[in-house]
Amino acid sequence: MSFTLAIVGRPNVGKSTLFNRLVGKRLALVDDQPGVTRDLREGDARLIDLRFTVIDTAGLEEVTDDSLQGRMRRLTERAVEMADVCLFLIDGRVGVTPSDEVFADILRRKNAHVILGVNKAEGRAGDGGAIEAWSLGLGEPIRLSAEHGEGMDDLYHILRPIAEGFAERAAADAPVVDVDVPEEEADLEADPEAHKPTVKHPLQIAVIGRPNAGKSTLINKIIGEDRLLTGPEAGITRDAISVRSEWHGTPIRIFDTAGMRKKARISDKLEKLSVADGLRAVRFAEVVVVLLDVEIPFEQQDLRIADFAETEGRAVVVAVNKWDLEGEKQEKLAELKEMFERLLPQLRGAPLVTVSAKTGRGLDRLHAAILRAHDIWNRRITTARLNTWLGAMVEAHPPPAPGGRRIKLRYMTQVKTRPPGFVVMCSHPDEMPDSYRRYLVNGLRDHFDMPGTPIRLTMRGQGDKNPFKERKFRTPSRLRKHLGKKD
C-alpha cells in the first residue's frame, strides 16, 4: 500500500526540484522566482524500493486570503491535510526565517508525520541552517541537496518504517470483497450468521457527501458524540479517519473523509481533491452512504462517487438530509426517486432514505437500510434455484440470434459474493448484446430480491474453463465417476 508525501515550505526552497528528482521527470516548473508553482502537482515517486505519491505544493506565504497567493496557501494547507507525511523544506543557506517558524507551527497541528528537511545544505554553506533548524521543534533535520541528490538515503531510512506502518494499517482497514463461493458449496444456502457484524469484524461504512450536506452532523448523531474527532482512530491515510462505535446493537466502523469536511470552493483543483478523498474512503467500506442535501440533490460530485462505489462493488444507500426543512414531502420524495432511477440506473432499487441529521429523525430507517444492503451484498443463491430461474427467463424472452445463430444459455452458477457474481455458460458469449445482459441482471434483482447491490454477470463459452477454474475438486465429478477415474 503506497502513501502520500507532500513537499511543503516557503517559495523557492527547492520543493519542485526535489519533486522532479523523486518522480524522475521534470513535471514541475523550476525557477528562481518565488511562487512559480501555483497549483498542486502529483506524481508517482520512487525512492530505492519505496513507491508512493508525492505532491508538489505552492509555497506557504503569509498573505491575505483574498489574493492569488492566499488561494495558493489554502491549497497547500489542503494538501497537508490530505497527505500521510509532510516533508517541510527550509533553505539551508538562508536559515530559519519568521515565516518558517509560523508554518512549522501550522504543520505540527495539521499532520501527524512531519519530516524536517534542510535543502541546499551541501558543503559548509548549509551548516548554519542545519543547526538553526533544530529550533523549529520538529525533531532532527535531514540535510538534503535536491539539485545534487544528496541526503536521499537519509530520507529513505525515515520513510521506510512509516511506509511499513501504513501497509499494516491498510491490511487491517481493507474489507473482504470478491469472496469466492467454493464449488462444493454452490448448492448450499448461505449461513446468515457468517457475515453478521461483530466487534472484531464490524460493519464498515463510509459516509460520503459534500461539505454542506450535513455529513459530520450525521456521523456525530450516529456515534453519540459531540465532535467527530473525539477519540478518532487513524485509518490508512490522514484523510480517512475511522471511528468505532455501536449503532442499535450493531458494531460499526464509520470512515469519514477530512477532505470533504471543509468547503472546497477555492478552485477546481480543490474540488477534484475533495472528490479524490471520497473515492479513497469508498475502498475502505462495505456499505457506502451517499448523503445528499435535499435542496441540491444529485450534483455531479454525488453522482461520481455513487457510480464509483458501484464500480468498486460496494453496497450503496442514498440518504437525503435536512428532510425536516422540506415542506412538500410527498412531492419531493417522488421527484427524488425519479431522479435517482434516471441518473443512476446501475443502482436501480437501491434504498433512498430521508433523514434529519440535526434531529435524528429517520436514523432508524437508515440503520435498517444499511443492514439490508449489507445482507444483500453477501447474498448467495443455490445453483438449482438459479438454473430454474434462468430457464424461465429464456422461455419468456429467448436470447437473440446474431447472424442466424441462436445463443444458447446452458448453465448458471454463483461464483462470488461481496458483491454477488454469477457466470452463465453459453454459446457465442462475445456476441451476447448488452441489452440481454441487462435483462438478466434486472431479472436477478427482481426475482431474488437484490435491489441496488452491484451484480457481476459473466458470459463464458463452451471452450472456456468451468466457473470454478483453478480450484481443486474435493469430490469426483459425475463424468469421472462414470469413467471410473479419480481426481
Swiss-Prot record:
Which residues are noted in the entry as GTP 2-binding?
209-216, 256-260, 321-324
- Region annotated Disordered sits at 451-487
Which PROSITE patterns does the record match to this protein?
A: G_ENGA
Q: Does the keyword GTP-binding apply?
A: yes
Question: One GO molecular-function annotation for this sequence?
Answer: GTP binding
Q: Which domain of life is it from?
A: Bacteria
**What processes in GO biological process is this protein linked to?**
ribosome biogenesis
For this protein, the record's Gene3D superfamilies field holds:
3.30.300.20, P-loop containing nucleotide triphosphate hydrolases (3.40.50.300)
Every KH-like domain range = 379-463
Pfam families cross-referenced by the UniProt entry: KH_dom-like, MMR_HSR1
- Residues reported to bind GTP 1: 9-16, 56-60, 119-122
Q: Which residues form the EngA-type G domain?
A: 3-167, 203-378
Going by the UniProt record, its keywords in alphabetical order are:
GTP-binding, Nucleotide-binding, Repeat, Ribosome biogenesis
Q: Which InterPro entries match?
A: G_ENGA (IPR031166), GTP-bd (IPR006073), GTPase_Der (IPR016484), KH_dom-like (IPR032859), KH_dom-like_a/b (IPR015946), P-loop_NTPase (IPR027417), Small_GTP-bd (IPR005225)
Q: Where is the composition biased (Basic residues)?
A: 471-487
The family annotation for this protein states: Belongs to the TRAFAC class TrmE-Era-EngA-EngB-Septin-like GTPase superfamily. EngA (Der) GTPase family.
**Functional note:** GTPase that plays an essential role in the late steps of ribosome biogenesis.
* Assembly notes: Associates with the 50S ribosomal subunit.
Task: Identify this protein by name.
Answer: GTPase Der
